[in-house]
């Protein structure tokens, strides 16, 4: 039997098994309750019966959001006022863990672990590791770099607790800088300095995390590809970033004039 190409790779996640899921008013699933196998689960049905929405509910329990629609109010069944997803998991020590998510229209959603509500949703990310595979994943190769960055963000955020915080802070600073760059009048250079410093500070964390992720991924990717190609071909990956051009703050500030000309940051 061929060797498993994933053997002997360093594990970053604890195994979590979904034992049971209950769904109420989630997209076209009005009510459902399923007990699941710890091995392979297959769902059969006609188009439009809710197979993908069931998988999206599982995704929601891991990432606090839908894989397809970022607007939570739109995932509530059209003639209902709320949705609820309940999941019962089992960790490697066979301890049960309950995850609850619910939201009413016009209010914020509530996420709870063992009946205790999270203060911040980012505290939940990484508890239940999950990879969502779909036909749209072809864009990782055929699409632009944004899709590949998104994949890195999804994976890294599940094992690096500070990554989401850095990513959110970077994006906030980026939006503020872009707003200044789009102004008709000359933007306040002192304000630009502030937001560029924020971008550099959080961007360094993001760059280092992505660089380390790619370095971890390369031997796994090569091992799998070698297994698939029977050793006839070799492949590799390389992460290219603006941060590799030098000190990130210097890079951002050097590009200020160019970014001002196009009206947004190119980083």
Language model segments and positions:
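Conserved NTPase motor "head" modules and their coupling/switch loops across ABC/AAA+ ATPases, GTPases
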Residues: 6-46, 72, 79, 186-267
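C-terminal lobe/lid and adjacent interdomain/linker elements of RecA-like ASCE P-loop ATPase modules
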Residues: 4, 10-17, 93-95, 104-106
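Conserved, well-folded catalytic cores of nucleic-acid-processing
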Residues: 61, 154, 158, 173, ...
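Long, charged N-terminal accessory/stalk domains
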Residues: 139-141, 146-193, 197
